[in-house]
Amino acid sequence: MTNLTLMNQLTPKQIVEKLDQYIIGQTGAKKSVAVALRNRYRRQLMDESIRDEIIPKNILMIGPTGVGKTEIARRIAKIVRAPFSKVEATKFTEVGYVGRDVESMVRDLVEVSVRLVKEEKMQLVRVKAEKNAEKRLIKLLAPSQKKKQTTTQNPIEALFGGMNQSEETTEEEVDQELKNKRSQIEWRLQNGELDDEIVTVEVKEQQNPMLDMMRGAGMDQMNGMQDALSGMFPAKKKKRKVTVREAKKILFEDEASKLIDADELAAEGIHRAEQMGMIFIDEIDKIASKEGGGNAQVSREGVQRDILPIVEGSQISTKYGTVNTEYILFIAAGAFHMSKPSDLIPELQGRFPIRIELDKLTQEDFYKILTEPDNALIKQYKALLKTEGIDLIFTKEAVERIAEIAFQVNQDSDNIGARRLHTILEKLLEDLLFEAPEINMESIKVTENYVNEKLAPIMKNKDLTQFIL
């Protein structure tokens, strides 16, 4: 099912309901993002003459850390399978300085988009690819003894690992004994009897980790150079010993890739990134210019001016082709404790017409976060201890006390929102998680007294609270 079909089936109200399964409160932010998403679907249904005139209304989320800014954007992208990329504004530097190039956010989005399209296309060819992979695996487990000796055609091929890729003869003479052996292996393979056997397969060599390190350090241009060079020479392969279970996955991916048209994949990936892509720019308040900032202010303003043309709409070169950013939805977010949205340069402010202020979390919100969402923290810890055969039970009073402590600590020290619950629950269940394998009990009940016993001593000492909770 394509993301356009998913968007067709989901109204803004239904999108908000789905977000409610994971995120507590922040109804205003959920509504704005749901409407922005639905407008993208509406735009796809319009005549071409008017469609190009309608651009997404970018969103600026304002609120403290841990209230759900990133999670809203990430969840909504998952719901409709839209390409989504999260970047931090502080990682970028002005053109000419060491740091990440602002255009890398678009390249990251296209990578995500192409991967999504590839996953969908792999599902379409799954049956044929699995059949081809199984045939190759059977031949690896029962190879023919009548192979022709392959020779290297020229020194250039030897240099770049260009040996003959085929491991079989052009016309393999398979005798009856080999046929019977392969037939038995096929039956055992399909029944999972050989999953733990070891087999040797050829796999593509992984990219040099040094290139990834340089890219992370801001040398994004190295990525383009590497892609250009990789296209000139065939990919080097090496032999690896893996289990049959793992070999199935490796060979399936290889066979599926052969059945997918690379040019079509790139074109569709770019189109989806352009029309459905979402880029979340976090910590945008950290690059807001403040009065009397000196050189730092100039640098921050430079990053804003570099981001501006991408948000306005420009052509960005990627290894898959040129991407037009005009119709990508940008969601920026920041706490704005030390600055205001008006501290951003006017041109950038104008590109984020929808402003949403997210609410601070209340004690009641903390209680709901612990219990209501599908991925609620308490449910996660219950599942963790269930693997040890222990049924973990929290009383209502215990959960209320945990919520109260989280709210109180946020009030007394730095407000880190819902992330405070992770710290408190880890401290609360620390001993239990450590001793769980040796505990011979089917169930353990966490009561209000237990919470007080574990956390009260820390709560009484302000210094300890700041360092531990």
UniProtKB/Swiss-Prot annotation:
<protein>
    <recommendedName>
        <fullName>ATP-dependent protease ATPase subunit HslU</fullName>
    </recommendedName>
</protein>
<dbReference type="GO" id="GO:0036402">
    <property type="term" value="F:proteasome-activating activity"/>
</dbReference>
<dbReference type="GO" id="GO:0005524">
    <property type="term" value="F:ATP binding"/>
</dbReference>
<comment type="subunit">
    <text>A double ring-shaped homohexamer of HslV is capped on each side by a ring-shaped HslU homohexamer. The assembly of the HslU/HslV complex is dependent on binding of ATP.</text>
</comment>
<comment type="similarity">
    <text>Belongs to the ClpX chaperone family. HslU subfamily.</text>
</comment>
<keyword id="KW-0547">Nucleotide-binding</keyword>
<dbReference type="InterPro" id="IPR050052">
    <property type="entry name" value="ATP-dep_Clp_protease_ClpX"/>
</dbReference>
<feature type="binding site">
    <location>
        <position position="282"/>
    </location>
    <ligand>
        <name>ATP</name>
    </ligand>
</feature>
<dbReference type="InterPro" id="IPR003593">
    <property type="entry name" value="AAA+_ATPase"/>
</dbReference>
<dbReference type="Pfam" id="PF07724">
    <property type="entry name" value="AAA_2"/>
</dbReference>
<comment type="function">
    <text>ATPase subunit of a proteasome-like degradation complex; this subunit has chaperone activity. The binding of ATP and its subsequent hydrolysis by HslU are essential for unfolding of protein substrates subsequently hydrolyzed by HslV. HslU recognizes the N-terminal part of its protein substrates and unfolds these before they are guided to HslV for hydrolysis.</text>
</comment>
<dbReference type="Pfam" id="PF10431">
    <property type="entry name" value="ClpB_D2-small"/>
</dbReference>
<feature type="binding site">
    <location>
        <position position="347"/>
    </location>
    <ligand>
        <name>ATP</name>
    </ligand>
</feature>
<feature type="binding site">
    <location>
        <position position="24"/>
    </location>
    <ligand>
        <name>ATP</name>
    </ligand>
</feature>
<dbReference type="GO" id="GO:0016887">
    <property type="term" value="F:ATP hydrolysis activity"/>
</dbReference>
<dbReference type="Pfam" id="PF00004">
    <property type="entry name" value="AAA"/>
</dbReference>
<dbReference type="GO" id="GO:0009376">
    <property type="term" value="C:HslUV protease complex"/>
</dbReference>
<keyword id="KW-0067">ATP-binding</keyword>
<feature type="binding site">
    <location>
        <begin position="66"/>
        <end position="71"/>
    </location>
    <ligand>
        <name>ATP</name>
    </ligand>
</feature>
<keyword id="KW-0963">Cytoplasm</keyword>
<dbReference type="GO" id="GO:0008233">
    <property type="term" value="F:peptidase activity"/>
</dbReference>
<keyword id="KW-0143">Chaperone</keyword>
<dbReference type="InterPro" id="IPR019489">
    <property type="entry name" value="Clp_ATPase_C"/>
</dbReference>
<dbReference type="GO" id="GO:0051603">
    <property type="term" value="P:proteolysis involved in protein catabolic process"/>
</dbReference>
<dbReference type="InterPro" id="IPR003959">
    <property type="entry name" value="ATPase_AAA_core"/>
</dbReference>
<dbReference type="InterPro" id="IPR027417">
    <property type="entry name" value="P-loop_NTPase"/>
</dbReference>
<dbReference type="InterPro" id="IPR004491">
    <property type="entry name" value="HslU"/>
</dbReference>
<dbReference type="GO" id="GO:0043335">
    <property type="term" value="P:protein unfolding"/>
</dbReference>
<feature type="binding site">
    <location>
        <position position="419"/>
    </location>
    <ligand>
        <name>ATP</name>
    </ligand>
</feature>
